[in-house]
From Swiss-Prot:
One of its GO terms (biological process) is tetrahydrofolate interconversion. It is an enzyme of class 6 (ligase). This is Formate--tetrahydrofolate ligase. Its EC number is 6.3.4.3. CDD domains: FTHFS. The gene is fhs. Keywords: ATP-binding, Ligase, Nucleotide-binding, One-carbon metabolism. HAMAP family: FTHFS.
Length: 556
């Protein structure tokens, strides 16, 4: 079979104007970036707000292998299949970060015959949103350092500045840096560091803001650090929220592209789910709900991270809650969660599938806690065997969860028809009764304990001394009614990436709590989660190239 990029380059794209015409979007509603990419104007976004709200399908997954389990591929393939069976459907997904594209992933626009196109553009610079977010973030850093240099009227304690610079790359050498060296003309020396752009609070803000005014309000609320008297300093205190919003004025508008089968897709925003809330923009999802009868969206990593955050953080900002949740499972991930070594995942092992099913079962139970019906999608791989598939279907039947095999990677829309029909039937026969996991009025400790004990199934939460001090500070400043955004490994329910399957009786340690007032949540850091990833021993970048005619090589 052709590679992803060979498939993508073999497709004759339709002009984006023609793709979105069936949604009632005209040429005048678009801000074009060439023939195949566009942003949707705010005038059109506001015009469709009075339209009925369609059905929302959330795609999540079991705890993944390092290569991922194909959530984006399944999301795209399911939407194509829904359109194939006559359902007016849109996609709303995140845009890739260049760091992982150059690192381990090599691309993040779906795969096989379930891709959003033009995949080369989407995986690289797209419409420039990532660069705008990077620039806004670093402009704030420059303005903070300039304030210190020009007399520090606000009394900012340079030892307690929370705000870091960012770059959209995996670069471990930048995690800890010192700025302001070289004498009095070069600023005030202080410790600083870089995060990856998708970990920036500005990325989270962009994905939760509903318009320019809300964007400015959220930007003004960012806490950049503390004064010498330990009181917080915000972007509003610096009076630069307008300048930051100006940099982001186009980035906030959702991007429109198409799938291989011509399904219209919003690809907008890209926070990670292990260090942020892991969902595409509220604006894109909300607008899709007003334009289509069905919207298919996804949340990053496993359901313990992305789906929990989608349901507890993003959903309250949407006009509706998910009508169904599709949990993507692969036999290789089930076998890994069942104790099989990574180099043996392609070998048949029915007993490992049985053992790893405990992981999938827990995710199904967790989704049901939110009052939403679950459907399991088996993302088919060539190494899957009939015996393994049969036992997984048998196990799903034992907990009364619908399950369908999906071959959208190899077969495109046709390979997702059975899944699409099952999802539509599930929505029709099992109306959702959404409820959040916790009430925001609970204490910070109680909210974290709810997530740990009810979603992860841990037995206890330990708060390190630093986090205890930060909780007291959060309460003192009146921030304790915000939801919690857990920063945790994606590979395990616990904070230990090696504790696979469905671990029990484990304790989770909270080492730090970071207020993200602009985004509207508090990040609870566990384990060794890094906000600036590093590159692997053999980065995907080593296989990338561009030919003299501009043809891109090596993305996948």
């Amino acid at each position: 079979m052709k590679t992803d990029i060979e498939i993508a380059q073999s497709i004759e794209l339709k002009p984006i104007v023609d793709v979105v015409e069936k949604l009632g979007i005209s040429y005048d509603d678009l801000e074009l970036y060439g023939k195949y990419k566009a942003k949707l104007s705010f005038d059109k976004i506001r015009a469709v707000e009075s339209n009925p709200v369609g059905k929302l399908i959330l795609v999540t997954a079991i705890n993944p292998t390092p290569a991922g389990e194909g959530k984006s591929t399944l999301t795209i393939g399911l939407a194509d299949a829904l359109n194939k069976i006559g359902k007016k459907t849109m996609i709303a997904i995140r845009e890739p970060s260049l760091g992982p594209v150059m690192g381990i992933k090599g691309g993040a626009a779906g795969g096989g015959y379930a891709q959003v196109l033009p995949m080369e553009d989407i995986n690289l610079h797209f419409t420039g949103d990532m660069h705008a977010i990077t620039t806004a973030n670093n402009a704030l850093s420059a303005l903070i350092d300039n304030h210190l240099h020009q007399g520090n009227e606000l009394g900012i304690d340079q030892r307690r500045i929370l705000w870091k610079r960012v770059v959209d790359l995996n670069d471990r050498a930048l995690r800890h840096v010192t700025v302001g060296l070289g004498g009095p003309l070069n600023g005030i020396p202080r410790e600083d560091g870089f995060d990856i752009t998708v970990a920036s609070e500005i990325m989270a803000i962009l994905c939760l803001a509903t318009d320019i005014e809300d964007l400015k309000r959220r930007l003004a609320n960012i806490v950049i650090g503390y004064r010498y008297d330990r009181t917080p300093v915000s972007v509003g205190d610096l009076q630069v929220e307008g300048a930051l919003a100006l940099i982001l004025k186009d980035a906030i508008k959702p991007n429109l592209v198409q799938t291989i089968y011509g399904t219209p897709a919003f690809v907008h925003g890209g926070p990670f789910a292990n260090i942020a809330h892991g969902c595409n923009s509220v604006l894109a999802t909300t607008t899709a709900l007003h334009l289509a009868d069905y919207t298919v969206t996804e949340a990053g990593f496993g359901a313990d991270l992305g789906a929990e955050k989608f349901l507890d953080i993003k959903t309250p900002n949407l006009p509706t809650s998910p009508d169904a949740v599709v949990i993507v499972a692969t036999l290789r991930a089930l076998k890994m969660n069942g104790g099989v070594a990574k180099d043996a995942l392609t070998e048949e092992n029915v007993e490992a599938v049985r053992a790893g099913f405990a992981n999938l079962k827990r995710h199904v139970e967790n989704i049901r806690k939110f009052g939403i019906p679950a459907v399991v999608a088996i993302n088919e791989f060539v190494s899957d065997t009939e015996a393994e598939i049969a036992v997984l279907k048998e196990l799903c039947a034992s907990i009364d969860v619908p399950v369908e095999l999906a071959s959208v990677w190899a077969d495109g829309a046709e390979g997702g028809v059975a899944l699409a029909e099952t999802v539509v039937k599930t929505i029709a026969e099992n109306p959702a009764n959404y409820k959040r996991l916790y009430d925001n009025d609970l204490s910070v400790q109680e909210k974290i304990e709810k997530i740990v004990t009810e979603i992860y199934r841990g037995s206890k939460v330990n708060f390190e001394k630093k986090s205890q001090t930060q909780i007291a500070q959060i309460v003192q400043n009146g921030w304790d009614k915000l939801p919690i955004c857990m920063a945790k490994t994606q590979y395990s329910f616990s904070d230990n990436p090696n504790a696979l399957g469905a671990p029990e009786n484990f304790e989770i340690t909270i080492r730090e709590l970071v207020p993200k007032l602009g985004a509207g949540f508090i990040v609870a850091l566990t384990g060794d989660v890094m906000t600036m990833p590093g590159l692997p021993k053999r980065p995907a970048a080593l296989n990338m190239d561009v030919e003299s005619d501009g043809t891109v090589l090596g993305l996948f």
